[in-house]
Amino acid sequence: MALLSIEHLSKSFTLHRVGRRIQGCDDVSFSIQPGEFVGITGRSGSGKSTILRCIWRTNLPEAGRILYDSERFGLVDLCTATQRQMLYLRAYELGYVSQFLSALPRQTAYEIVLKSALEAFGVDDRARAEAETERMLRHFDLDEELWELYPRTFSGGEKLRLNIAAAMIKRPRLLLLDEPTASLDDASKLKVRELIEQLKERLR
C-alpha cells in the first residue's frame, strides 16, 4: 500500500483586492511508497508549495483526496481528518521543513531541537530527549560550538540542517521539504540529501 496517495487534488485562491482567483494546483494525482524520495518540479508559482501545504493541511483543498496510511488511524483522508487527528499526525508521523527557520527569536539551536525531542519522547524522558538532540545535531554536521548560539547568525546551510534536525528527531514517516534548499549551491543540496538518506537507513 502507498504511504500517500493524492487523487485529483485542486486548490485555488481568491485575491480579494483585485477580485481575481488564481489556481494553486489543478487535478493533481500521484502516490508515494514507503522509503521513496519524490520530487515535485515546476516553475515558480506552479503549485509545488500549495500541494505540500494541502498535505500538511495549512491549505484546505476544494477538490480531491489525500490518502495517508497512518500507523495509528489506518487509511485517513487528510482533507477531512479531524483537528485532533491532524495534531497527532503532525506531532508523531508527519514532518514539514520550509526554506524559513521556524523558531522563537531567543531560542538556541540546541533548544530548538530539544523542544522537538521532548514533544516526541515526552517531558518525563528528558535524558533520552537530550541524548537524541545531541546525536541529531552531530549527524547534521552542526558543530558543538553552534549549539548555544541563536540561529539568526547561521549560514543558510546551517539553518537548513537545523530545521531538518528538528523535524527528523521525531522520526516522521513522511517528511515534506518545501523548497528548503532553494538558496543553497548544488554541493550543499547534495550534502543535505545524503544526510537524510543516511539517517533514513539508520532509523529503519
Please annotate each region the language model reported.
Residues 100, 107-119:
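Q-loop/switch helix immediately C-terminal to the Walker
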Residues 167-168:
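ABC ATPase C-loop
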Residues 65-88:
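ABC ATPase NBD Q-loop/coupling interface
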Residues 171:
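Conserved catalytic motifs of ABC-family nucleotide-binding domains
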Residues 175-178:
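Catalytic Walker B motif of ABC-type/P-loop ATPase nucleotide-binding domains
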Residues 56:
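Helix-to-loop junction immediately C-terminal to a conserved catalytic motif
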Residues 127-145:
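Conserved ABC ATPase "signature" region
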